[in-house]
């Protein structure tokens, strides 16, 4: 027996389940005792044969589904017969194709060894011209395409439900929310703007005896606008006791994501200066258009009283205090008492909390940055009621309110999406209401999506593969050589307690039904936001519940909605969530594809999320999801060396294409890519060894895996969006997400004869773990 095979069998001796469970040697298993201490891990061990399909996967219910798949062959044959190439000429057609491919392989030998991603996706990139059919998302890939499809499905379910239940209270409420966001509502918006202006005028009136806490509490009571507050309040899980909610205070988010644009730097190149001037010019155009929208501000339709420069100046002031120098700690987690906030930071927490609506004042608060908090409070107390800041308060409201009127949102799109992000077109009117519907009717949308799309076979398969890969990752960490014993022990403990959620959360709250209006979207959102805010206030210090979250800056679903096409590792709960919407082709395909394909798609996603347990951020949290420093000093230093090498690799690969970017921004994603790709390669490698395939089959199957990995990463980005994506996207460009991890795999380099000096060569073959 070859040494390689012996080593494999030693690593996976525990997988010989029959011998283990049917003998009296169970007590003698020492290194693998973990399999019997935890029922979840025990189940993993029982199923972890490292094969695609097992008896456990195809239970009685699933056998029926699988048999139904067989009947679809007839339908596919009908399509096959109608294919544009006559049946009697198809062999010759394929012969010609193969000859051409062989010629291309010789011609493109340099491309294979220098840019594997482009070699595999060359044909696709030539055929797909994204400018011909512009999309509202700048990255055209499987994730966005399928998410768009899901949005249209949800809208169809909504319309079908309304049609079927015309007179029900829920159907009427859903219909009103949807219609309000697809129809023009300028008159209603003008009324809301007047109310906002009246509130701000009253706040600035010395006779009303109001102060900065009236403004801050009002803004923070509305989550749609609170992200723009100079001091943002949120109720979130306590990072050091994640089973309980606690109040958090964080600092401002500015309008423009690239904060350097606000700063005049003498060392800027001419190109940089032109770009900064271009952005500032269009930002001012946007602001003038925004203030000109509403009659209470611009009654004569010609001039308004607000100066865009005021907003620029205020945001520059906020940027300055966010980076102010102080001897105080800049840790992201700072637990302070209400008394400390008031005495040391001059922030009247008691008054602020009372005006937020708290009946019992929270005693402790988590602050993201103490230095920035102190400087921000000093600034806003001095200037909050100046004319410049009054303009800023109005802007915070109007920026978000305008996005809920079907006509007005085009102005927001023209600057924030088109100029800043390079988006060619806005989100279609028909699916734009999804964010509002998700806020108001998340449970309804979840139930509808599950009813129409749940595929138990895919759920079972994904759970099975999750457990297999989790077990394999456990063994990989177990044999790690650079972690100190105490760090390794904590890492293994974290994997043992990792929770896997596939499909949708087990418990979700009922949707409240309000008297929504069909022509007033802002009113509708305020109804739900006010209700939700009161719910949050009642949760201070209490156990967590499932609350669907929305990123209101980007109108993006960020919670555990089952209709999100993505997967997540959540460090504060030490869990991986794979929504139901992700369990569909091309991400998983058990009808027509084999192990290599599914490993490269759903398998790679799972392995990637598993690796986030220990990335630059996930490594700060322990097995319970609590913020906890469980690393030794030596391990931290060693890990930083590895991170530095990863950053260097991604920047080096990009420079070859003339692209310069800061790879540190997305290093956590890069670490997860490198570790995840290595994990699924090891999974397939072990399957091939255990199945005793001959070497030529092993090589062929591994090649298929690498090809599919490149295919799953295929993506095109609109030219105008590349610059912004390099600055704000935590994920590097897909080309480097494929090529960089592959270049670290010894098997990949051996199979494709990659040598030092080739573009696909990297001197470091570490998979991090």
PLM feature spans:
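Extracellular/luminal recognition modules and glycoprotein regions
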Residues: 83-143
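Arg/Lys-rich, intrinsically disordered low-complexity tails that mediate electrostatic binding
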Residues: 1-16, 20-42, 49, 78-79
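Short, solvent-exposed loop/turn elements at domain surfaces
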Residues: 124-129, 255-258, 586
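Noncatalytic, helix-rich "gating/capping" subdomain that lines the substrate-entry/channel surface
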Residues: 149-469, 505, 523-524, 532
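Active-site rim elements
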Residues: 100-105, 261-276, 459-460, 650-668
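Extracellular mucin-like PTS segments
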Residues: 46-54, 59, 65, 71
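Hydrophobic/aromatic-rich, well-ordered segments within soluble, folded domains that form packed cores
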Residues: 105-126, 267-291, 677-679
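Intrinsically disordered, low-complexity linker/terminal regions across diverse proteins
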Residues: 92, 317, 321, 332-361, ...
